[in-house]
Amino acid sequence: MAISTTACFKDSNINVDPNRSTSVDPALLFSGASTQFSLLRVAELTWPIALMNQMWASGGRWGLSQAQYDQTRIRSAWGRTYTDVHKNLNVAVEIAQTSQPVNKNAVAQCKILMAFAYAQTSLLWGDIPFTEAATGKVDFPKFDKQQDVLNGCIAMLDEALGMIDPNGKGIIAPNDLYYGGDMAKWRKFANSLKMRILISTKLLKMIIITIG
């Protein structure tokens, strides 16, 4: 008669996914978010916006010109702005803020890009999720008023400008696809973006007054 028994290893790690990272470099999150943001601006948003504004002529071969309003691309741009851009930048900010010492330039770069993405999203769609968005804590974030979103973007830029150290590059520098860690250029960009948003808010107020 033969008897067999089975048992688990004493220190079994079967509940630990070996393919899932438990820590991440904020520089990689930043480069991933910036790449996706640029891709969305060039590929996902260019052609539908250009066609709707009659900047492009498709010759009748594009679906939009045939009144075939497929939401795939537009919804993709909306969703991926939050999942691929805002979410990754939020995580990068959290990691940079908890590092010792706090990497202020990294936080500033992430917040500037985040303000850029939120401003673009709001100027395209109006009221959007902002205060509760991309935190990983709220499944159905509320929609904030467009004016509140743009004001929040300005506040985000002011916070970032106050953190910039032009003499330091920080941990994101090797993965900075825009300015290679040159914080003086990031400061110029943040100020230019702030001016652009302020002009947009002024125009929005004029439109609201005009239409009553």
What are these regions (language model features)?
Residues 1-7:
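Sec-dependent bacterial lipoprotein signal peptides
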Residues 8-11, 46, 151-170, 183-212:
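Aromatic-residue-lined binding/catalytic grooves and analogous aromatic/hydrophobic interfacial grooves
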Residues 39-43, 117-127, 204-206:
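Secretory-pathway/luminal and periplasmic proteins that interact with or process carbohydrate-rich
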Residues 61-173:
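Conserved, well-structured interaction surfaces
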Residues 8-64, 68-72, 80-83, 87, ...:
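Membrane-proximal, proline-rich intrinsically disordered regions
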